[in-house]
Amino acid sequence: MQIKKYLTEDLNLPLIDPQIEIKQRDIFPNQAAPVLLYHDDKLQLVNKNWGYPSPVDPKKPMFNARIERFYENKPSMWDHSFAKQRCLILSSEFFEYAKTTYQVANGKKYHDRYRFKTNNPITMIAGIYDQNDFSMVTTAPNKDTAPIHNRMPLIIEPSELRRWLFQNFTSLIDRSAINLEVQKEPHQK
C-alpha cells in the first residue's frame, strides 16, 4: 500500500505534497526514513535519520526513547522532543530479535527473529524528532511481544494519531489492548 494514498484517502489527512521520494523498503537504524510530523502549520512527510546523536558519544546514536523518561523528575535529552516534536514512523511491520538462539550446520548461532504488524495497512509507531533525526518511542511490551522482548514500539492506532501528534498522550502509554500479528521467520541455513 502506498503511504501517501493511505494517509490522504483512507485516513483523510490534510497532507501537503511531500517533497521527498517515498520508497517502500526496510529501514534500519542510521538510515533516512519518512516520518509524519506537523511543522510550519502543515502535516507533512519528511525524511529524517533514525538515531539521535548521543550526548555522551555522538558516534553512537540513540535509536529508541523510553516513554517513561518523559514522566521522570530528572531532565533528559528527550524532554523537548516529547513535549513539542512528536512524529509517526510509518511501516508495514516491525521486527525484533528474540533471546533464543539456534545453531546452523557450520556451528554459527543466530537469534530467532519475529515480525509484528497491526491489522491496519500501515503500522504507525510513535516517534520524536529534532532537526535532522528521529527516535522510536518504546513502552512496556504487550502480550504479543512480551515473550520475545522486554520493550515494544509505542504503536499508534489511526484513531489516536491526532492525540499523539498534538495532545496529552498519557492514555497512549499502555498498549496491552493492541493486537499484533506475530510471525516467526524461518531459520537461516
Model-derived features with residue positions:
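Short linear sequence motif anchored by a di-proline
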Residues: M1-K189
